[in-house]
């Protein structure tokens, strides 16, 4: 069994593969109209030429790499929004010089617009996806002695946010969708469990129906982490709108981005008030009190400060207007690739909990195990097609500092109260998740891939797959 020193390479780069957090979003092709795909050889035909890894000519002369999605769509809309903030001389969200005769309005309007887009009542704009998680957990009342169940495969921020509140992270396995396994989730519930943190990982929704049913049955709160899935839906519902709260990241690797930022959404006024106070030094400002629309139910309390700036919100307002187009472009490319290779004998893709709701920024192909996966990746890279293991996150229970339960200070309440005193992490906490990570090959997609780029991906997979899968 590899230890996390090997697995942790997914945080920055798989050996020789340039895996970076710019691939944080995940693959799930959306349904699209049937398209004409490039000519291809018969499904069972051997490749016409040797693989590039074996000395043959590559499919492409240069490496095909997926670029950051949101910044590719920057134009005069973002520019004009930023100029408006500059000319108004009011970059802080609550007050300013108001040189154009109006108070700052980018943050408050983004919150209204994003809440409407996500079909929720409230939104709090914050500085990052991590601070969104921390604010949402505060709104849900999580603290020492509470347990929060989360998937073993996710980003470190999920674990970190739980620890920040002195609560105990409890890991559940993921399934072939790479999202939390509802059955294993239920097995991990104890009387101390307070919140289920379901992470819509790598651009694809978790299976929310059984998760919500478990939560209702066991009287638990559900926090949807949509950091890697802005623009994703589940059975017609935007992710983040089905649980008690949802969070999003607008970091540069995400669907839309001003460089960094985050948001919390909810339709529960108490969760909104708690998250709002937590992100703003315990205060409920007049602007948010007006949005709340009812008397405050909480007192001022000591907390951090994670307010978004007007500059960040300005870019996000312009990006939000383009979100549906970006998602449609992602899905178009991924659907065409999938259609072009789906007839290959025995090919298996990532399981989908919603065939049309994913972001569509990865194509994942299953293999027999790590050795075959690694050869598949090397072969595709030799053809100048970027390919990676499951990226953008980590198998948290085997991260060295998590397995050792390292904290900022000794005596951290997460591990001195209740089950936290005896809980053990490590590989035995997630064998199924490790197996899944060892099997999947990921091809990152770009919403602005050209027709030739799409054709090259199809050609490379069709060239490599029959050879590698026999090995």
What are these model-predicted stretches?
Residues 8-32:
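N-terminal secretory signal peptides and thylakoid transit peptides that target proteins
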Residues 36-93, 116:
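C-terminal segment of N-terminal export signals and the immediately downstream linker at the start
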Residues 52, 138-226, 233:
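PLP-dependent aminotransferase-like
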Residues 96, 105-147, 161, 171, ...:
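Phosphate-binding glycine-rich loop
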Residues 283-293, 336-341, 377-440:
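Conserved PLP cofactor-binding pocket of PLP-dependent enzymes
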Residues 351-354, 359-370, 390-408, 438-451:
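Conserved PLP-binding active-site segment of the aspartate aminotransferase-like
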């Amino acid at each position: 069994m590899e230890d996390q020193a090997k697995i942790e390479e997914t945080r920055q780069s798989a050996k020789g593969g340039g895996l970076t957090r710019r691939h944080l979003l995940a693959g799930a092709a959306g349904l699209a109209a049937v398209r004409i795909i490039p000519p291809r050889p018969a499904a069972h035909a051997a490749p016409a030429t040797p693989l590039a890894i074996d000395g043959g000519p590559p499919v492409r002369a240069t490496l095909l790499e997926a670029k950051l999605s949101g910044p590719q769509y920057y134009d005069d809309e973002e520019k004009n929004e930023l100029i408006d903030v500059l000319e108004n001389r009011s970059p802080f969200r609550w007050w300013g010089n108001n040189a154009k005769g109006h108070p700052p309005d980018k943050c408050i309007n983004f919150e209204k617009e994003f809440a409407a887009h996500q079909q929720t009542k409230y939104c709090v704009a914050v500085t990052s996806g991590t601070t969104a998680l921390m604010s949402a957990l505060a709104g849900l009342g999580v603290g020492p002695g509470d347990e929060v169940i989360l998937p073993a495969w996710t980003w470190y921020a999920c674990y970190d946010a739980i620890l920040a509140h002195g609560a105990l992270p409890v890991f559940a396995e993921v399934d072939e969708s790479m999202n939390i396994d509802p059955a294993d989730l239920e097995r991990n519930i104890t009387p101390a469990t307070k919140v289920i943190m379901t992470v819509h990982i790598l651009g694809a929704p978790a299976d929310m129906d059984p998760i919500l049913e478990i939560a209702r049955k066991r009287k638990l709160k559900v926090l949807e982490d949509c950091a890697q899935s802005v623009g994703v839906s589940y059975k017609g519902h935007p992710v983040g709108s089905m649980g008690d709260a949802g969070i999003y990241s607008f970091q540069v690797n995400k669907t839309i981005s001003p460089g960094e930022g985050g948001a919390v959404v909810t339709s529960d006024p108490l969760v909104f008030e708690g998250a709002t106070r937590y992100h703003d030094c315990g205060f409920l400002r007049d602007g948010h009190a007006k949005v709340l629309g009812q008397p405050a139910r909480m007192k001022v309390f000591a907390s951090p400060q994670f307010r978004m700036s007007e500059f960040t919100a300005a870019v996000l307002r312009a990006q939000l207007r383009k979100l549906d187009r970006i998602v449609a472009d992602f899905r178009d490319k991924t659907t065409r690739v999938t259609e072009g290779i789906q007839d290959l004998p025995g090919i298996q893709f990532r399981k989908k909990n919603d065939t049309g709701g994913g972001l569509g920024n990865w194509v994942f192909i299953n293999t027999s195990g790590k050795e075959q996966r690694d050869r598949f990746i090397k072969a595709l890279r030799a053809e100048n097609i970027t390919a990676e293991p499951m990226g953008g996150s980590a198998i948290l229970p085997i991260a060295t500092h998590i397995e050792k339960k390292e904290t900022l200070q000794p005596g951290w309440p997460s591990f001195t109260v209740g089950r936290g005193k005896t809980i053990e992490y490590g590989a035995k906490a997630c064998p199924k998740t490790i197996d899944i990570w060892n099997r999947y090959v990921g091809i990152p997609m770009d919403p602005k891939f050209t027709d030739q780029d799409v054709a090259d991906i199809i050609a490379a997979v069709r060239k490599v797959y029959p050879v590698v899968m026999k090995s």
